[in-house]
A protein has these predicted regions:
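Compositionally biased alpha-helical segments
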Residues: 1-129, 153-164, 189-198, 202-209, ...
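Short, solvent-exposed mixed-charge patches
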Residues: 221-224
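Short, solvent-exposed, Trp/other aromatic-anchored flexible loops in extracytoplasmic proteins
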Residues: 121-190
Length: 224
């Protein structure tokens, strides 16, 4: 419940219902609806409305891979480091101004070489603001390093390669506004579980945790 005030000083106590056709609807304590044109709202109330209603947004991700620069003296044979940089863009679709803050999240997934399990290699978050300068397009970058190497005298290839991404945008209350992924196996009902993972954890296609993969070398040693 809020006390609204128009530019003429008229005060109305009520709960915000919606914005429609250039006005807002407020529900009074007795249940009646009252309409107030946006241009008649006080500056404080207009700012409140512009932070209350999250806009329609879309999110897109462009992932680029590059070989990590390393000191040649410390490079082992068959030891590859790849940096994946994800450029995330959040674009406001709705025309109504929005002065609040959204949160964007991006998760970079790898696929383990030995078992095929998935692992969270990197993640990043950013506070999303739409301004006159960015014209409703907010971008940020997140990077993660993937390592693939041979172990035990080249008997086994270990590490993880880049598999894909998940991007999510939420409103100030934590409600999801939009999500985007290039992982065909990642179902909507499993996304929240993945968002709770920490970097380095292993999991399967249903986003259930798995134990750290152990080298097959130990099984092979028993046969000798």
């Amino acid at each position: 419940m809020r006390v609204w005030e128009d530019v003429n000083g008229l005060q109305i106590k009520g709960k915000f219902v919606r914005e429609i056709f250039g006005s807002i609807e407020v529900q009074r304590p007795n249940g009646d609806l009252h309409s107030i044109p946006l241009e008649d709202l006080s500056p404080e109330d207009l700012t409140y409305v512009r932070t209350l209603i999250p806009p329609d947004v879309v999110v897109s991700v462009r992932a680029k891979e590059s070989v990590k620069d390393r000191n040649e003296e410390f490079i082992w044979a068959n030891d590859k480091l790849t940096v994946v940089t994800a450029e995330v863009e959040v674009r406001k679709k709705s025309r109504s101004p929005y002065q609040g803050t959204l949160k964007a999240e991006v998760y970079l997934i790898g696929k383990e070489m030995v078992t095929g399990a998935y692992t969270l290699v990197g993640k990043g978050t950013s506070r999303v603001h739409f301004t006159e300068e960015n014209k409703g397009r907010y971008t940020f970058n997140t990077s993660a390093t993937y390592r693939v190497y041979e172990e035990y005298n080249n008997l086994e290839t270990r590490g993880a390669e880049y598999e894909g991404y998940l991007a999510v945008v939420v409103d100030p209350q934590g409600n999801k506004l939009v999500q985007e992924s290039d992982l065909s196996w990642l179902l909507d009902e499993n996304i929240d579980a993945l968002r709770q993972f920490y970097v380095g954890i292993f999991f399967d296609e249903t986003c259930k945790k798995r134990s750290v993969p152990r080298p097959r070398y130990y099984d092979g040693r028993e046969r000798f």
